[in-house]
Curated annotation (Swiss-Prot):
Molecular function as annotated in GO: structural molecule activity
Note: Individual Salmonella serotypes usually alternate between the production of 2 antigenic forms of flagella, termed phase 1 and phase 2, each specified by separate structural genes.
Example of a GO cellular component annotation carried by this entry: bacterial-type flagellum
NCBIfam families in the record: PRK08026.1
InterPro entries to which the protein is assigned, alphabetical: Flagellin (IPR001492), Flagellin_C (IPR046358), Flagellin_C_sub2 (IPR042187), Flagellin_D3 (IPR014981), Flagellin_N (IPR001029), FLIC_barrel (IPR049365)
Lineage: Bacteria, Pseudomonadati, Pseudomonadota, Gammaproteobacteria, Enterobacterales
Function (record text): Flagellin is the subunit protein which polymerizes to form the filaments of bacterial flagella.
Protein family according to the UniProt entry: Belongs to the bacterial flagellin family.
Entry protein name: Flagellin
Location(s) in or outside the cell: Secreted; Bacterial flagellum
Primary location recorded for the protein, binned into one broad class: secreted
Length: 495
């Protein structure tokens, strides 16, 4: 080996080995201090990517487990509210059983009905006010989607249903004596026809000398106070017929035909209180007369009172629901069946083809095919004002109305079954969430173990590596000192 002083190969070799052992010592210390085998991608590029995917799954599954617990909480909240609704239904059923006993007086039935109404109101309150984190769980049909996995589409649905007295079919539950309810086909009142009032008809009716007259705009008017019909006649020439232009009373037949009596006298002024009509107007009695009629009727078992369902068709061919009516013998009075068993006189409005708000006429079936109508003028009349007090409490009417065959127990049992079905669904979904939580926990444990084997430090190995590196550092430092002394051997050759 040549003796040189410019390059100390032994020193350079020793320094290189010392740097390697120092790097190994640093890596060992980093892994021991962090507990991780992979502290950056350079430690294990593939292992770092795999471990990072495991971390994403583990964090997602951990949150999914918390989501599932939230799902259990909302299901428990809903089920708790349903339990209270069930308690109220059980009490309603108990009261219904009590009301079925014939020993109860009408006063007893009224008291029982009062508590039933309060219980149903409480069911409505629980339904409308029970909420979880701002979500009203029984106020409407709703599907809640709970994320129970780390990936898209891994969900469990909670189907919530609107539960109140109406959806349970109990909003009209009444254990008092009832009116029979049935459907009746009702014929619409006749449409007015002015075909007969052509030129010749107006010539005869007005007593004019020519037949050049016509009905202005083809309109017929009606005065609800005097019960008279009118048309406005106009003439096209400038002869004496012009003086005959104006309003005339006309006759209206049940079939809607409009005619004029010969030589009818023209109205001195435009009639007041008239409105345009397109159908035959045959109003029934006013509320006061209804009261008198009901009071005087003394309805017997052979002449029972019933509730009837009505509808009619307007001039545009639109079918409009006229609601309920109270039928006493051949007379029918427009009414609405209220939740508490009383009845209220109906009001109905609709918009015609020209966009104008019109008074709706409820078609009420009369005796012997006769068609009667009730004019609805925008006012609502409570049955208590029409008959002195609620129809349901009218002695004659209450005794006359045969108790309905409606079975309140069957309706309540159906409501209980509906509540039980939803409670069963909620119980089942809670069990699903519990199962999902258990599975998520197992998966998180297994994935954590897999990730640990990839990125966690093996302390036995790393301590051994650190000890080896430390020894190499100490030895390398000592050897480097010796290697640095080698060039001094050249001095002996120069002496």
């Amino acid at each position: 080996m040549a003796q040189v002083i410019n390059t100390n190969s032994l020193s350079l070799l020793t320094q290189n080995n010392l740097n390697k052992s120092q790097s190994a010592l640093g890596t060992a210390i980093e892994r021991l201090s962090s507990g991780l085998r992979i502290n950056s991608a350079k430690d294990d590029a593939a292992g770092q990517a795999i471990a990072n995917r495991f971390t994403a799954n583990i964090k997602g599954l951990t949150q999914a487990s918390r989501n599932a617990n939230d799902g259990i909480s909302i299901a428990q909240t809903t089920e708790g509210a349903l339990n209270e609704i069930n308690n109220n239904l059980q009490r309603v059923r108990e009261l219904a059983v009590q009301s079925a006993n014939s020993t109860n007086s009408q006063s007893d039935l009224d008291s029982i009905q009062a508590e039933i109404t309060q219980r149903l109101n409480e069911i409505d309150r629980v339904s409308g006010q029970t909420q979880f984190n701002g979500v009203k769980v029984l106020a409407q049909d709703n599907t809640l989607t709970i994320q129970v996995g780390a990936n898209n589409g891994e969900t469990i649905d909670i189907d919530l249903k609107q539960i109140n007295s109406q959806t349970l079919g109990l909003d009209t539950l009444n254990v008092q004596k009832k009116y029979d309810v049935k459907s009746e086909a009702v014929t619409p009142s006749a449409t007015l026809s002015t075909t007969a009032l052509d030129g010749a008809g107006l010539k005869t009716g007005t007593g004019s000398t020519t037949d050049t007259g016509s009905i202005k705009d083809g309109k017929v008017y009606y005065n609800s106070t005097s019960k008279n019909y009118y048309v406005e006649v106009e003439f096209t020439d400038a002869t004496d017929q012009t003086n005959k232009g104006g309003f005339y009373k006309v006759n209206v037949a049940d079939d809607g035909a409009v005619t004029m009596t010969a030589a009818t006298t023209k109205e001195a002024t435009t009639p007041t209180g008239i409105t345009e009509v397109t159908q035959v107007q045959k109003p029934v009695a006013a509320p006061a007369a209804i009261q008198a009629q009901l009071t005087a009727a003394h309805v017997t078992g052979a002449d029972t009172a019933e509730m009837v369902k009505m509808s009619y068709t307007d001039k545009n061919g639109k079918t409009i629901d006229g609601g309920f009516g109270v039928k006493v013998g051949a007379d029918i009075y427009a009414a609405t069946k209220n939740k508490d068993g009383s009845f209220s006189i109906n009001t109905t409005e609709y918009t015609d083809k020209d966009g104008n708000t019109k008074t709706a006429l409820n078609q009420l079936g009369g005796a012997d095919g006769k068609t009667e109508v009730v004019s609805i003028d925008g006012k609502t009349y409570n049955a208590s004002k029409a008959a002195g007090h609620n129809f349901k409490a009218q002695p004659e009417l209450a005794e006359a109305a045969a108790a309905t065959t409606e079975n309140p127990l069957a309706k309540i049992d159906a409501a209980l079954a509906q509540v039980d079905a939803l409670r069963s669904d909620l119980g089942a979904v809670q069990n699903r969430f519990n199962s999902a939580i258990t599975n998520l926990g197992n998966t998180v444990n297994n994935l954590s173990s897999a990730r640990s084997r990839i990125e966690d430090s093996d302390y036995a190995t790393e301590v051994s590596n650190m000890s080896r590196a430390q020894i190499l550092q100490q030895a390398g430092t000592s050897v480097l000192a010796q290697a640095n002394q080698v060039p001094q051997n050249v001095l002996s050759l120069l002496r």
